[in-house]
Amino acid sequence: LANNISEKTFDLVMTDTKFLANVIKYDRYQPEFYEDTKTYVSKRSSTKKLNKGIDFYLNNKDLINIVENKFEIEKELLLSLMGIETNYGTYVGKMDILSSLATLSYDKRRSEFFTKELLILLKLIDENQIDYKSLYGSWAGAFGFFQFMPSTITVSYTHLTLPTTD
């Protein structure tokens, strides 16, 4: 199969994959495309969110400092992205991202991009780097605390344990 993905993995993973019509609707109506910057930012920032970010940092200071130093990304940027994308990991999405990526691959608008993402994700599953049973995230196929797309994860990725959000 494509990308040297085993037939076994493909069959196992894609058996429950389905077309999600709502994903196409979400793709056509993204706030980043119709809200001006001021509106977009004001809807996603508040004193409450800032305080939640401070608490998250204080509770995870050692790990965040390791990530900041290892990847040379300021902790303030990391925390800001995490706050916007997942409210500090409290909402990482509920969509089956395999079905989301398959749906967006089928749709002609950005088929090439999403097909590539789907194939990368299948390869990561095939190599046992990601458990396909835990792949829930955004309608666009992003997942985790930072809502990364599969292409942002490489074969030589660094595993760091993040806190759970029970």
Residue ranges and their predicted role:
Residues L1-E68:
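An acidic, Gly/Ser/Thr/Pro-rich helix-cap/linker signature
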Residues S42-Y157:
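Acidic/His-rich structured neighborhood in mature extracellular/periplasmic domains
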Residues T158-T164:
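Conserved small/polar residues in nucleotide/adenosyl-binding loops
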Residues N87, T164-T165:
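A very general structural signal that marks isolated residues within well-ordered alpha-helical segments
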